[in-house]
């Protein structure tokens, strides 16, 4: 707080709780902390080209100002606890009665026994209603027909003045700026120029329409298809330019040259008729009583004929609190243009505007100007600078200005200490934060409750539960009453460390203490359940919150949509989006991301593309993550041509691909064995200056191993070594799998030894691939030894390991060994799948006619298990098994009758066509072929391509 008593508002965007009014008795200082996120930085007003201003128009000396407004945070009071059914009410809280009371503070010296705080929070201003669109003046005069040649009378004026690639966009919000206008329409193609028509009477607003000139006519046609799209609450009119505006400008120029007429309608209306003193009082009264109404504040200021330093200072401070640094600077320069010298307080307000807008370079420029003019920097000025760097995450710069403040000012206050502590908590440097707390206490400065919250938030970020509880205990010992912010810190701590049960316990303690939840605490609870994939409790918390009368915001809706997508209920997720729109909540890109990914993951690319188009029509500009979601789905479906089309569309929209985009494309080509394309996109990734990581090399190695180019794979590993990229178990598994496909046991064994030397532990996938290599080489003794070795190391075989072993015994024509392996697998509690039954039954049927009786009984047992499991084989497998049955039971029997129950339903119609059996020379089954050729599918149990997907 400065000497004049002005209250600074500082936002802390990383706080996990919402703003709450905190009061203490007999405050010694008054500091206003705003825990809300700062409003978005408004873009600079666009400069209108010279040819867009009418020559007759005279601009007045004053124009009304507008300011972008952040979204307000509604404060709906809670009536009852919505989490009443989630915990046991009769249980006693160990958090308050046992666990918290048993912790001892070990990181700071003792605090003062009586600490006081007066905190006053101001909600952000409401969004302004969209002003009516200014209609452009239409000139009614037309060219004289007698001055035109006869051939020009039949010429179409629309074709004469129309420009290719130019579109008209109408019904724009009058407050929109050129950068936002250009950013939205940039997604349809490269833009040559953007023309945003300024308002006639308010030049800082637009007239409600503008023009986009694309480099290609195709881009303009594509943009016109989105006529009727929603853009910041307005339904846009998008159509090709008809040349009418250029024709009107030509008519205006002709009249100006020939007649010299002045359009009296363009003259600005004067607003200087009110009394100066009454206007000043009106401004002060509005700032005191209705400061959130930005329209009323600006209107009152514009009515002052000759503002003084006081009025200018009030307006700079008003814009500074809102983070509107451009209008704050404009007001500051208007003051200097009148010959008024700024004071330290006005400079501080301007610096505060830049700090809230995250433009610390301009803030430091103001500091240099202050020093050049000999204006002393107050402690409040230093506090604002330190707070600005803290919010920007620049702890070193914050330390520099904090040290300078200590050198210049002998005594510091809790405000500047709170900001420097916040800077180090956000960078997870808790040792430095603890040292600052000790330093503050040694100076005799009482820590307000906000600093306790900052420390608890810092320990939450580093997941230090013990010290977080120590701070909570110390807070209560110093006489502070825990608020919803305090309990919100604890809830956030427990949800971050995965202890949702303790978070529920904190919620119960809140109810006992009479503290009600807010949107932030509810959001933390829902996030905790979503992380644990406990969808039922997440929805229960959401429903209880709605019953309490609280209105969810966009962030909460996004969390619920993610929960619906996580449980696979995509229809309910889309329904929730529609509910958001009915409640006038504007969906964001994050709203649609989980829906697009959900449909893509399930393989429904048609619906995924529909949601992508729906997102665009809602006014959301696609990001690289949105495009990556579509590409991931297409790659999983192996639709590489469509994936490349999405990549091209992404480039056309001006969205730069990242490492994940190219890596996913490379993985797609690797899955189909197209090594050339994989290397092509690897080169493209490097040419664009993107970082090459281990995931990129894994995709390249999979492409080489899939196509059998092991020498190329070795060259890739050498390049990895040259770049100092260590090989992990996934890289080794890919290489071992590549040699296993070729049956090269020696190379695979060498890689396993190399793994052990480098300290990389072989896992189940490594051993499974090596067993596959042994099976293909016919070395089943070594495969058996590998099983014993992995069991000795505590690595248990899984179903893919046993499937590989069964295939090996089948390939070695030892069905009795395969049957023994099958029995061992069931004894370990592993449930057989379709691939196991296929491999085992094929092997047994091939030997049943000449083998012992127990093999025949084994075939019967397996057939009955398949029938009970409801497994149906494909037609190729059925034909092959039928040929084996003819050798065992030529005239049919119990085995034939049982086995035919696993055949396809249309088997009987094919069975009567005897010629069909003669034409079948090979077996084409659902699962991998027993012979295990090098060109096996990705479902091959030895392939590691599907094993890497969880890692990615």
From Swiss-Prot:
For bias type Low complexity, the affected ranges are 58-68
| One Pfam family named in its UniProt record | RRM_1
Which residues form the organelle targeting sequence per the record? 1-60
Which Gene Ontology molecular-function terms are recorded? mRNA binding
InterPro entries of this UniProt entry? Nucleotide-bd_a/b_plait_sf (IPR012677), Pentatricopeptide_rpt (IPR002885), RBD_domain_sf (IPR035979), RRM_dom (IPR000504), TPR-like_helical_dom_sf (IPR011990)
- Residue windows of the PPR repeats: 308-342, 343-377, 378-412, 413-447, 448-482, 483-517, 518-552, 553-587, 588-622, 623-657, 658-692, 693-727, 728-762, 763-797, 798-832
The answer to whether keyword RNA-binding applies is: yes
> Where are the compositionally biased (Basic and acidic residues) regions?
137-163, 259-280
Region named Disordered: 30-95, 115-163, 259-281, 918-952
Q: Is Chloroplast among the key words of this record? A: yes
Q: In this protein, which residues make up the domain named RRM?
A: 167-238
Q: Where is the composition biased (Acidic residues)?
A: 921-941
Keywords on record: Chloroplast, Plastid, Repeat, RNA-binding, Transit peptide
Per UniProt, the ranges with Pro residues bias are: 37-49, 122-133
SMART domains, per database record = RRM
User: Where is it chiefly localized?
Assistant: plastid
Q: Which domain of life is it from?
A: Eukaryota
**Compartments where found:** Plastid, Chloroplast
Single GO BP term: embryonic pattern specification
GO terms for cellular component = chloroplast
> In UniProt terms, what function does this protein have?
May play a role in the plastid ribosome biogenesis.
Family that this chain belongs to: Belongs to the PPR family. P subfamily.
The protein here is known as Pentatricopeptide repeat-containing protein At5g04810, chloroplastic
């Amino acid at each position: 707080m400065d000497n004049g008593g002005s209250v600074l508002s500082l936002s802390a965007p990383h706080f996990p709780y919402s703003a709450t009014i905190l009061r203490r008795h007999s405050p010694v200082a008054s500091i206003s902390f705003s825990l809300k996120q700062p409003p978005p930085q408004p873009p600079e007003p666009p400069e209108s080209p010279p040819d867009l201003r009418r020559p007759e128009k005279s601009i007045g000396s004053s124009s009304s100002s507008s300011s972008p407004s952040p979204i307000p945070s509604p404060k709906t009071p809670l009536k009852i606890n919505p989490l009443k059914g989630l915990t046991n009410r009769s249980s006693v809280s160990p958090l308050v009665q046992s666990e918290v009371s048993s912790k001892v503070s070990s990181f700071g010296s003792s605090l003062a026994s009586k600490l006081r705080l007066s905190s006053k929070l101001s909600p952000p201003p409401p969004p302004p209603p969209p002003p009516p669109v200014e209609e452009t003046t239409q000139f009614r005069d037309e060219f004289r027909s007698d001055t035109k040649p006869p051939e020009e009378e039949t010429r179409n004026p629309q074709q004469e003045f129309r420009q290719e690639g130019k579109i008209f966009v109408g019904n724009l919000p009058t407050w929109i700026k050129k950068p936002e206008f250009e950013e939205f329409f940039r997604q349809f193609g490269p833009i040559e120029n953007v023309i945003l028509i300024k308002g006639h009477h308010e030049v800082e607003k637009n007239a409600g329409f503008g023009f986009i000139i694309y480099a290609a006519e195709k881009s303009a046609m594509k943009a016109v298809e989105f006529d009727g799209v929603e853009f910041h609450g307005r339904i846009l009119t998008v159509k090709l330019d008809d040349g009418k505006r250029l024709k009107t400008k030509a008519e205006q120029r002709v009249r100006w040259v020939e007649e010299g007429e002045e359009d009296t309608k363009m003259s600005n209306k004067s607003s200087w008729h009110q009394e100066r003193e009454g206007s000043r009082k009106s401004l002060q009264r509005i700032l005191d009583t209705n400061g959130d109404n930005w329209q009323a504040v600006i209107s009152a200021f514009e009515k002052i004929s000759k503002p003084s330093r006081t009025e200018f200072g009030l307006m700079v401070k008003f814009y500074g609190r809102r983070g509107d640094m451009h209008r704050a600077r404009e007001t500051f320069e208007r003051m200097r243009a009148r010959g008024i010298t700024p004071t330290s307080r006005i400079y501080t307000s301007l610096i505060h505007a830049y700090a809230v807008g995250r433009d610390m370079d301009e803030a430091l420029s103001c500091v240099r100007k202050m020093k050049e003019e000999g204006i002393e920097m107050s402690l409040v000025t230093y506090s604002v600078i330190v707070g600005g760097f803290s919010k920007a995450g620049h702890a070193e710069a914050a330390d520099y200005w904090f040290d300078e403040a200590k050198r210049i000012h002998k005594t510091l206050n809790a405000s500047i200490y709170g900001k420097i502590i916040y800077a180090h908590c956000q960078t997870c440097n808790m040792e430095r934060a603890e040292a600052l707390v000790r330093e503050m206490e040694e100076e005799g400065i009482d820590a307000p409750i906000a600093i306790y919250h900052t420390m608890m938030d810092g320990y939450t970020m580093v997941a230090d539960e013990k010290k977080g509880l120590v701070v909570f205990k110390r807070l209560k010992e110093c006489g502070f009453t825990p608020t919803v912010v305090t309990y919100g810190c604890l809830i956030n701590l427990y949800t971050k460390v995965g202890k949702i049960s303790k978070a529920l316990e904190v919620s119960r303690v809140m109810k006992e203490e009479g503290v009600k939840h807010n949107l932030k605490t509810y959001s933390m609870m829902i996030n905790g359940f979503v992380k644990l994939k406990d969808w039922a409790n997440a929805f229960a918390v959401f429903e209880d919150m709605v019953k309490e009368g609280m209105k969810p915001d966009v962030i909460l809706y996004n969390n619920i949509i993610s929960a619906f997508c996580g449980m696979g209920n995509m229809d309910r997720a889309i329904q929730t989006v529609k509910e958001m729109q009915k409640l006038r909540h504007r969906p964001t890109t994050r709203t649609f991301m989980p829906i697009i990914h959900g449909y893509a993951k399930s393989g429904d690319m048609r619906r995924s593309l529909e949601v992508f188009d729906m997102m665009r029509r809602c006014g959301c500009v696609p990001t690289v993550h949105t495009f990556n979601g579509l590409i991931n789905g297409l790659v999983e479906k192996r639709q590489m041509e469509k994936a490349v089309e999405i990549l091209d569309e992404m480039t056309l929209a001006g969205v730069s691909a990242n490492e994940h985009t190219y890596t996913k494309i490379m993985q797609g080509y690797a899955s189909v064995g197209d090594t050339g394309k994989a290397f092509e996109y690897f080169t493209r990734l490097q040419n664009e200056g993107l970082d090459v990581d281990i995931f990129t090399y894994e995709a390249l190695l999979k492409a080489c191993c899939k196509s059998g180019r092991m020498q190329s794979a070795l060259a890739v590993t050498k390049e990895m070594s040259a770049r100092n990229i260590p090989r992990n178990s996934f890289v080794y598994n890919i290489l071992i799998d590549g040699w296993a496909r070729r049956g090269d046991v020696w190379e695979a064994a060498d890689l396993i030894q190399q793994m052990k030397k480098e300290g990389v532990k072989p896992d189940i996938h490594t051993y499974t691939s090596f067993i596959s290599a042994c099976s293909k080489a016919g070395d089943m003794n070594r495969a058996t030894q590998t099983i014993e070795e992995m069991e000795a190391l505590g690595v248990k075989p899984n179903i893919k390991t046993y499937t590989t072993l069964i295939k090996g015994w089948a390939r070695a024509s030892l069905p009795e060994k395969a049957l023994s392996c099958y029995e061992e697998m069931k004894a370990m509690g592993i449930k057989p799948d379709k691939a196991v039954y296929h491999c085992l039954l094929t092997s047994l049927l091939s030997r049943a006619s000449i083998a012992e009786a127990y093999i025949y009984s084994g075939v019967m047992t397996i057939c009955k298990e398949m029938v009970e499991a409801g497994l149906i084989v494909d037609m190729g497998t059925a034909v092959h098994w039928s040929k084996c049955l003819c050798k065992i039971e030529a005239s049919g029997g119990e085995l034939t009758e049982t086995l035919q129950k696993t055949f396809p339903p249309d088997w009987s119609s094919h069975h009567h066509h005897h010629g069909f059996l003669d034409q079948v020379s090979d077996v084409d089954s659902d699962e991998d072929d027993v012979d295990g050729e090098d060109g096996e599918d990705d479902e091959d149990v030895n392939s590691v391509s599907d094993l890497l997907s969880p890692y990615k």
